[in-house]
Curated annotation (Swiss-Prot):
The keyword Chaperone does not apply. The gene is rplI. This is Large ribosomal subunit protein bL9. InterPro entries: Ribosomal_bL9, Ribosomal_bL9/RNase_H1_N, Ribosomal_bL9_bac/chp, Ribosomal_bL9_C, Ribosomal_bL9_C_sf, Ribosomal_bL9_N, Ribosomal_bL9_N_sf. Residues 168-177 have a biased composition (Basic and acidic residues). Residues 157-167 have a biased composition (Low complexity). Keywords: Ribonucleoprotein, Ribosomal protein, RNA-binding, rRNA-binding. Binds to the 23S rRNA. It comes from Solidesulfovibrio magneticus (strain ATCC 700980 / DSM 13731 / RS-1). Belongs to the bacterial ribosomal protein bL9 family. It comes from the Bacteria. The keyword Ribosomal protein applies. GO terms for biological process: translation.
Length: 177
């Protein structure tokens, strides 16, 4: 089935492309969703008339996405997690958690657009890509910290230093306790 795309469709084509798809996909999804129309001579002429409007709409969409990418680059999300021994997370930080944090900040981004190869399972700072359009990606800074705030991290970082210093002085931390 030959169709003309009226919008960008992931893994298929871009606005204005003439594509060949299976009849069921075209009839049951692309055409009813307004993403494509049959590639008949009449529709080709109609599409040429609509293409200027659609291209203007697409340009506006790209401009909005670039603005969103700039705003995302400016923010940093802090996610507090419970941590066990050895700084190992209980569970993991997933795209859904990141999307919820973005929603709290007023960004309406679907979790499927957040790109993580695998969930985050350790403390640290991450630069997480967000797919805004097929050809445009933004990124958001995500910091995964120990629940209870940075004070706990400072205490945890200070403890090995105190133990090393006590051992250097000839005292064991276990003997004093």
């Amino acid at each position: 089935m030959e169709l003309i795309l009226r919008a960008d469709v992931e893994n298929l084509g871009r606005l204005g492309d003439k594509v060949s798809v299976k009849p069921g996909y075209g009839r049951n999804y692309l055409i009813p969703q307004g993403l494509a129309m049959l590639a008949t001579p009449a529709n080709l002429r109609r599409f040429e008339n609509e293409s200027k409007k659609l291209q203007a709409k697409r340009d506006a969409l790209i401009a909005d996405a670039k603005g969103l990418a700039d705003r995302l680059a400016e923010i940093a999300i802090v996610i507090e997690v419970r941590v066990g021994e050895g700084a190992k997370l209980y569970g993991s930080v997933t795209t859904a958690i990141i999307a919820d944090k973005l929603a709290e900040l007023g960004f309406d981004i679907d979790r499927k657009k957040i790109v993580l190869a695998e969930p985050i399972r350790s403390l640290g700072h991450y630069d997480v890509p967000v797919k805004l359009l097929p050809e445009l990606r933004g990124s958001v800074k995500v910091s995964v910290v120990r629940q209870g705030g940075p004070e706990d991290e400072e205490i945890a970082e200070a403890a090995p230093v105190a133990e090393a210093q006590a051992e250097a002085d000839g005292h064991s931390t276990e003997e004093t306790a």
